[in-house]
Amino acid sequence: MATFKDACFHYRKITKLNRELLRIGANSVWTSVQSNKIKGWCVECCQLTELTYCSGCSLAHVCQLCITNKRCFLDSQPHLLKLRTFESPITKEKLQCVINLYDKLFPINNTIINKFKKSTRQRKCRNGLNETWYNQLLLPITLNAAVFKFKTRTVYVFGFYEGSVSVENLPYRIINCIDIYDRLLLDQINFERMNSLPVSLQSIYAQKYFRVSRIPSMKLRQIYYSDFTKQNLITKYRTKSRIVHRNISKINWNTEIELHNTLTHNKNKILEILSTSIERQFLVHDINLGRVKADMFELGHQCKPNYVSSNHWQPASKISVCKWCNIKYAFKDMDWRMESMYNELMSFIQACYKSNTNVDHCSSIESIYPIIRNVYWHSTTNYIDETLNKLFSMMNPVCIDSQSVINFHCQIDLSLYLHIKMILEMEVLPFILNVNQFKDIIKGIMNQWCNFSKLSELPLCIESTTTLLELEKQGKLSEEYDLLISDSDDD
């Protein structure tokens, strides 16, 4: 196991390029970070171990030792992990770049074998050519990749992933790209590669190659918001932002093939870029549909529908002494926009319900309560219209001129009054509402701070480093609300 890690350790002394590219955290002396009890393959050193969350993309794909390097496959710095990363579609030309990379960094010839013999002959027990001391020579060239399937794109990180483990909690899946290249041609490349090995190691090399190169591809899995860590989220002005670390180089390549051509024909340029690259910290907003869905789901569980039957004049989130309506604790760590939306939505439903029914205390048990929870749970789904129709029917609508309408005459606060006027585009609010107006008001309240249809599915931390730099120049990394707050007392 951990053949790739061992190869990185021993081959790093071969050339100057290897010394820079093969310096991975798993071979360092740094103290490991706390485990998150997720077992899988570290995409940097390829060993099967306990993983932790990457500081660059917030996904669990790096081991407790490699995390010290703070490298991510989304970096722009041409380190080893970046060189093994390709975006879809995968072509034969890209796979040839992977093969050439392995052949350049991990060659097997008589010179290399003799070099390793000299470095390991320290005692008599090391004279034999066995797997224990020469594991670095047993690295076959395979075309397996850890695949991250984002909403808009798919990223392949190639490596030698040995062993098996449950992938249920992993954000990636292992895919075998051998058939995209050429199965027989890859076999020939590995047979020629192992010819220089001693006979005792050739059989072990062949077993490793065929065992890993013939594994079937796993079914790809879409990455969801729940796959991202919350450890790098910070709360500021009751908004959440995510800390992202990226390694940035002065030069960017348009395609992965251009990067590999530079490595092949001008390795000194790669060495220069590696020595001048810098690490940058970005503070990106965390507004995305995945987080909104999670917050809405939590709000549906925590909400107190009894408020719509009450005579409380305070906003729904400020009730603290009523045991049927108290939800104040639920907004301790929740975004301020969720609290604002909750207050307006509950106040509007309360006004409609009190205008059309005979209830006057929050302790009463009403059949409308489960539907109010469903409004939050279905707010980002296609079932929202059906749920709002059910909610409207609970208001005891009457038919006037073949149209169902409800009364709307209870007192509401000024901010909600102005907001409803803006949604309906009216100068004066009507005293009756039809079903379409009722649905438009609720959807307008929910979409007040962010339009669900225009939100990205996943956080900004999955974007490439180049994209983050462009968004930073445009001022789109931070939330607009943050930009309105000044640290100066004079502003």
From Swiss-Prot:
It comes from the Viruses. GO terms for molecular function: metal ion binding; RNA binding. It comes from Rotavirus A (isolate RVA/Equine/United Kingdom/H2/1976/G3P4[12]). A motif (pLxIS motif) lies at residues 483-486. Interacts (via C-terminus) with host IRF3; this interaction leads to IRF3 degradation. Interacts with host IRF7; this interaction leads to IRF7 degradation. Interacts with host CUL1 and CUL3. Belongs to the rotavirus NSP1 family. It is found in: Host cytoplasm, Host cytoskeleton. Residues 1-81 are annotated as: RNA-binding. GO terms for cellular component: host cell cytoplasm; host cytoskeleton. This is Non-structural protein 1. Residues 318-491 are annotated as: Interaction with host IRF3. It holds the Pfam family Rota_NS53. Residues 82-176 are annotated as: Important for cytoskeleton localization. Plays a role in the inhibition of host innate immunity by inducing the degradation of key host factors required to activate interferon production such as IRF3, IRF5 or IRF7. Associates with components of cullin RING ligases (CRLs) including CUL1 or CUL3, which are essential multisubunit ubiquitination complexes, to modulate their activities. Residues 42-79 are annotated as: Zinc-binding domain. The integrity of the zinc-binding domain in NSP1 is important for degradation of host IRF3. The pLxIS motif targets host IRF3 for degradation; however phosphorylation of NSP1 pLxIS motif is not required for its activity. Keywords: Host cytoplasm, Host cytoskeleton, Host-virus interaction, Inhibition of host innate immune response by virus, Inhibition of host IRF3 by virus, Inhibition of host IRF7 by virus, Inhibition of host RLR pathway by virus, Interferon antiviral system evasion, Metal-binding, RNA-binding, Viral immunoevasion. InterPro entries: Rotavirus_NSP1 (IPR002148). GO terms for biological process: symbiont-mediated suppression of host cytoplasmic pattern recognition receptor signaling pathway via inhibition of IRF3 activity; symbiont-mediated suppression of host cytoplasmic pattern recognition receptor signaling pathway via inhibition of IRF7 activity.
